[in-house]
Amino acid sequence: MTDRLHPTRTIVTGASGELGQAMARQLAQPGAQLSLWGRDGEKLAAIAAQCRAQGALVNVRSLDLTDVAGAVAALLAEDDACPFDMAIFASGLGDIRAQGALVEDPAQVARLIQVNFTAPAAMAAALAGRMAGRNSKGRLVLISSAAAFHALPFAASYAGSKAGLSRFTDSLRIAMRPHGVSVTLASPGFIDTAAGRAVPGARPMPLSPEEAARRILRAAMAGRKGMGRAHLVTPWHFALLRLFDRALPRFLRDRLLRSLAPPGW
């Protein structure tokens, strides 16, 4: 990574996950200040040690983003202490309905929506307003999923929460652009992580966490006047699948999406 891809102070949520860890490693260099948030304290400590070995100054915060108000308060407190140049909201939960069930568990639906949509949207909104008022503008990166493009009957809460985040991010980008704040939406396909491999079903064209992180960070720094790409879909094949989904008659699309469920689901 080149120096221009390393903002001075960055927060990465989901930093105990494999994608978030890859983001942190690629941002870590002498002079970089990283705030790494995640659920797993042991994994946070391990990635923090790696980033410090690369010369970065690192602090960690272990928390559950289902406490949305607490997460926003903690974010603003850290921003008060030392303003963020960049925020990467990479936290997320993935799940499908239980085998044999007609619908997903209501408590799990609520949890996925809080972690995948409500928390990152609220945190991004809180930070965007502050960044807009600064002389040195900031960057926001929100990680959605190619699953947001499709109505997945066996993963309604995951696809739905990511779709909500995608529309929110695009709306925020339009609102913030006149104020010089860059907002990038990333919609990766399958990322080869332990959590992803635990979910039954095919995973075509998987990206390693390191490659996904590299593509997302480059997209965040690209574009006219360095304002970042509005939307990264990677691998590009998933953009074609999105168009295919839109072009199909509804009855054919519904039949196809039902057929994607793992056997027995």
Regions found by a protein language model. Give the residues of each.
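C-terminal helical subdomain
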Residues: 185, 201-242
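Conserved glycine-rich Rossmann-like NAD(P)H-binding loop of the short-chain dehydrogenase/reductase
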Residues: 32-47
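Residue(s) in the substrate-gating loop at a strand-loop-helix junction
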Residues: 145
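Rossmann-fold cofactor-recognition segment
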Residues: 51-69
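Active-site helix of classical SDR
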Residues: 124, 161
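Conserved mid-core segment of classical short-chain dehydrogenase/reductases
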Residues: 94-110, 154
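Conserved glycine-rich cofactor-binding loop
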Residues: 16-17
